[in-house]
């Protein structure tokens, strides 16, 4: 019997899916949790788009059922199991008796036992007004046999069986309550007819021991209780081929021979349970029906022991599943495949309708029950041609016409490997009832680059599975050669070797174990003695070329001049219209993308511009966004430089927005005063004795986590250069005049257009913490500044046609003189203690 722990594992099952199974469009950055940078990603259009909880989706999908049908949610089942948990042992004994009575064909005795258990459970409960109704709508056992979904295609009747205590969470999922197929129910049951109908469905005169009924057309007038319209259409349209489909279903239900009917019934119950769980979790009943029923057919083919591969033409390379499981990638299907998904909502169905973790456990359970896998994965894909009855009987493909349109079958790229059953050779005989206790079953993984296919993966004899590497690299090149030698007599040549032109989900080279579930890779090395490597956003499917071939500075040194190409190859997902796709969250370029203004590095320095022919510096900085509601009000955005011209008595300021060039009034508390130039002794005594000017090009600024270090400086340079190469043809770097003095560094930007107003940023020398050129390319120069008020740091990067070492020496000289004068003022060394 299933207990509360099993039902809880079923209800929380989808929340345990790996984070790699997600849609390819999804570029969410969950590796970093910088709270102060979340607003920038929202403004840039990136958005931290997390997938909603799978349990939440399940509850929504269960609530979208149009017609009332008796499918219970996992939460309701959990409550019902909790109510009648005390009678579990009594009902276990009754189910054993009922199973014996069912084999003898005594249907009346089973019905009596079921009603007895119903009375016992009803007496032990606290009386409530609706307790009798709820138990009338439920079956007489804890199997919930009144329900069913996709297993109506299987024609498997389910008897009771007792399950051992769960040993692992995989076994817990497999031992879910057995469901009753819907095909034998003409209409939704009424309370008065339920007991009589259950006697007929569980033990019929014309059924064999497994409950397979003789072929007879379904009732045309009764409405099907299934909420899946695709299954209803298939049942009505393919009722003419009942003999062939039901004959193959009977063969599927009994693996091997008639002496193994108990194992076949257990397989049928397992497939019924898992298939119904998948239907309850499907979010879109219309589009998921074809996929789910197609998955059921694939599972049945894998459970058939006598399935012999039909001679088929050599499949195309794109239709061939990969031989080695690599990881759980997130990626799109082949665009040139004929099985490409035609709807945008298909990726959403992969988490609910396909239930890949359920399928992996189902397949491993089928192997442990003694079935052998299919030899040719192509049998699950294309509808086979009409065959004679003898050939159809030997070919285990129930209801071959049930395969929907191939475009409806296509799904996202999912590759799944079972963790526990990786080792073990293929069974010697196709009808082996059960593997030895010390020999684990072979590993089957679901691989559907363009469709759902169950493909076997055999480990060589004598090898043990390494659980840590079963998802990343299940077998190396040497293991592949051993596999090919072992399977030469059993599998075709096209199944043993991957064609060179076929698309594989991972790299052809063995992948490292650290790449498991690594959908998005970021590398930021800040150690000064380590080779710096900053990798942009990429999928793990392209890990063979994910690192930049050349650093940004090396490439520009080779190409000479102010070339901004940071690497020889531009990422595929990068486009000039969306330059933020390659931005990591540690380094956000805020000057390159002018639309992102919150948390910008413009607030690190003092902004100045020409106002009425005179250069004026900002006096305030906007801390909130202000939307004007009257013509005389001034629009403000966060970090806008503001020149306050007048302060009103009613706490309103009249000022000039240096970013927009507009004047108006705004609330006084929407802007804070910024610390102006140093009014100390150093600044008031004399003007700077010297000023150095350099003509350079300004690339951008980026926020950095530390205030100094060559690693930080080089990482910021490479990040900005890599980002600028995407927009260099749209917005070339602005020419900039650097003025270096004892007061600080002043950036005067000037554009080519007449509408561009000349502006400048001033960084006080006391806020400059680090500067230098790139160690391998002196054309790049940058310096790190501290925010005047906050504990934040930003790096500003420049490039020039010539070496920028004179700029670095000038800044170093100014800093040294400023530091000496500051020490002389702050810590005077007078001979006050000498006599």
UniProtKB/Swiss-Prot annotation:
InterPro entries documented for this protein: JIP1_scaffold (IPR047178), JIP2_SH3 (IPR035637), PH-like_dom_sf (IPR011993), PTB/PI_dom (IPR006020), SH3_domain (IPR001452)
Entries under SMART domains matching the protein: PTB (SM00462), SH3 (SM00326)
Location of region: Necessary for interaction with FGF13: 242-509
Region (Disordered): 1-26, 44-357, 369-509, 544-579
Subcellular locations according to the entry: Cytoplasm
GO molecular function, one term: protein-containing complex binding
CDD domains membership: PTB_JIP (cd01212), SH3_JIP2 (cd11942)
Listed GO biological process terms: behavioral fear response; dendrite morphogenesis; excitatory postsynaptic potential; JNK cascade; mating behavior; negative regulation of apoptotic signaling pathway; nonassociative learning; positive regulation of stress-activated MAPK cascade
Biased amino acid composition, Polar residues: 142-173
Assembly and binders: Forms homo- or heterooligomeric complexes. Binds specific components of the JNK signaling pathway namely JNK1, JNK2, JNK3, MAP2K7, MAP3K10, MAP3K11, MAP3K12 and MAPK13. Also binds the proline-rich domain-containing splice variant of apolipoprotein E receptor 2 (ApoER2). Binds the TPR motif-containing C-terminal of kinesin light chain. Binds the cytoplasmic tails of LRP1 and LRP2 (Megalin). Interacts with DCLK2. Interacts with FGF13; enables the interaction with MAPK13 and may regulate the MAPK8IP2 scaffolding activity. Interacts with TIAM1 and TIAM2. Interacts with SH3RF2.
Protein role: The JNK-interacting protein (JIP) group of scaffold proteins selectively mediates JNK signaling by aggregating specific components of the MAPK cascade to form a functional JNK signaling module. JIP2 inhibits IL1 beta-induced apoptosis in insulin-secreting cells.
Family from the record: Belongs to the JIP scaffold family.
Protein name stated in the entry: C-Jun-amino-terminal kinase-interacting protein 2
Source organism: Rattus norvegicus
Gene: Mapk8ip2
């Amino acid at each position: 019997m299933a207990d509360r722990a099993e039902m809880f594992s079923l209800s929380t099952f989808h929340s345990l899916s790996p984070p790699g199974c997600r849609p390819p469009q999804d570029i969410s950055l969950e590796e970093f949790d910088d709270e102060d940078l979340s607003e920038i990603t929202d403004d840039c259009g990136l958005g931290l788009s997390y997938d909603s909880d799978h349990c939440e989706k399940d509850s929504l999908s269960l609530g979208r059922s149009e017609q009332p049908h008796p499918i219970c949610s996992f939460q309701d089942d959990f409550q019902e199991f909790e109510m009648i948990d005390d009678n579990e042992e009594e009902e276990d004994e009754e189910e054993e008796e009922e199973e014996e009575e069912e084999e003898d064909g005594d249907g009346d005795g089973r019905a009596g036992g079921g009603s007895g258990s119903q009375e016992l459970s009803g007496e032990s409960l606290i009386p409530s007004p609706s307790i009798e109704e709820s138990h009338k709508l439920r079956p007489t056992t804890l199997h919930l046999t009144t329900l069913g979904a996709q297993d109506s295609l299987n024609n498997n009747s389910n008897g009771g069986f007792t399950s051992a205590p769960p040993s692992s969470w995989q076994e817990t999922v497999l031992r879910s309550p057995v469901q009753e197929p819907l095909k034998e129910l003409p209409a939704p049951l009424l309370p008065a007819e339920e007991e009589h109908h259950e006697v007929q469905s569980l033990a019929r005169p014309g059924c064999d021991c497994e409950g397979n009924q003789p072929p007879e057309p379904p009732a045309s007038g009764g409405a099907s209780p299934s909420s899946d319209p695709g299954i209803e259409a298939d049942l009505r349209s393919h009722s003419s081929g009942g003999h062939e489909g039901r004959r193959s279903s009977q063969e599927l239900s009994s693996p091997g021979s008639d002496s193994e009917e108990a194992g076949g019934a257990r397989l049928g119950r397992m497939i019924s349970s898992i298939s119904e769980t998948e239907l309850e979790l499907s979010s879109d009943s219309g589009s998921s029906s074809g996929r789910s029923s197609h998955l059921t057919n694939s599972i049945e083919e894998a459970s058939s022991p006598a399935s012999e591969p039909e001679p088929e033409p050599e499949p195309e390379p794109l239709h061939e599943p990969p031989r080695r499981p690599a990881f759980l990638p997130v990626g799109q299907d082949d665009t040139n495949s004929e099985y490409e998904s035609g709807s945008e909502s298909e990726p959403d169905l992969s988490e609910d309708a396909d239930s890949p973790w359920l399928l992996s456990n189902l397949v491993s359970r089928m192997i442990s029950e003694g079935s052998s896998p299919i030899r040719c994965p192509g049998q699950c894909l294309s509808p086979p041609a009409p065959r004679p009855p003898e050939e159809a009987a030997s070919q285990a493909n129930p209801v071959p016409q049930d395969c929907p349109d191939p475009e409806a079958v296509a799904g996202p790229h999912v590759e799944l490997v079972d963790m526990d059953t990786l080792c073990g050779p293929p069974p010697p005989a196709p009808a082996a009832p059960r593997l030895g206790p010390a020999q684990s079953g072979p590993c089957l993984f679901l691989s559907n680059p363009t469709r759902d296919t169950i493909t076997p993966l055999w480990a060589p004899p004598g090898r043990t599975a390494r659980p840590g590497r079963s998802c990343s690299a299940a077998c190396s090149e040497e293991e592949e050669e051993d596999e090919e030698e072992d399977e030469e007599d059993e599998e075709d040549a096209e199944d043993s070797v991957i064609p060179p032109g076929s698309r594989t989900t991972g790299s052809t080279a063995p992948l490292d174990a650290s790449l498991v579930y690594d959908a998005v890779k970021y590398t930021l090395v800040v150690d000064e003695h380590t080779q710096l490597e900053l990798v942009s956003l990429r999928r793990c499917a392209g890990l063979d070329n994910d690192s930049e071939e050349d650093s940004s500075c090396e490439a520009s040194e080779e190409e000479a001049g102010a070339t901004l190409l940071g690497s020889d190859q531009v990422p595929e997902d990068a486009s000039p219209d969306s330059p933020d796709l390659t931005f990591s969250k540690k380094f956000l370029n805020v000057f390159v993308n002018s639309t992102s203004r919150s948390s910008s590095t413009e607030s690190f320095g003092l902004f100045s511009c020409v106002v009425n022919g005179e250069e004026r510096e900002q006096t305030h900085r906007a801390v909130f966004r202000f939307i004007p509601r009257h013509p005389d009000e001034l629009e403000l955005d966060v970090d806008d430089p503001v020149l306050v011209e007048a302060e009103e008595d009613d706490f309103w300021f009249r000022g000039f927005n240096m970013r927009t060039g507009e004047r108006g009034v705004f609330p006084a508390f929407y802007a804070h005063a910024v610390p102006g130039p140093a009014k100390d002794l150093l600044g008031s005594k004399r003007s700077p004795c010297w000023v150095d000017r350099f003509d350079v090009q300004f690339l951008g600024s980026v926020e950095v986590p530390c205030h100094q270090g060559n690693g930080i400086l080089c990482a910021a340079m490479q990040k900005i250069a890599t980002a600028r190469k995407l927009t260099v043809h749209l917005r070339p770097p602005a020419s900039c005049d650097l003025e270096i003095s004892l007061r600080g560094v002043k950036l005067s930007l000037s554009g080519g257009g007449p509408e561009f107003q000349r502006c400048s940023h001033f960084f006080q020398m006391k806020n400059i913490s680090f500067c230098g050129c790139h160690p391998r390319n002196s054309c790049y120069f940058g310096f790190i500044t501290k925010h005047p008020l906050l504990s934040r740091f930003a790096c500003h990067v420049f490039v020039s046609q010539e070496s920028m070492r004179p700029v670095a020496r000038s800044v170093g000289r100014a800093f040294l003189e400023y530091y000496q004068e500051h020490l002389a003022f702050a810590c005077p060394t007078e001979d006050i203690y000498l006599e």
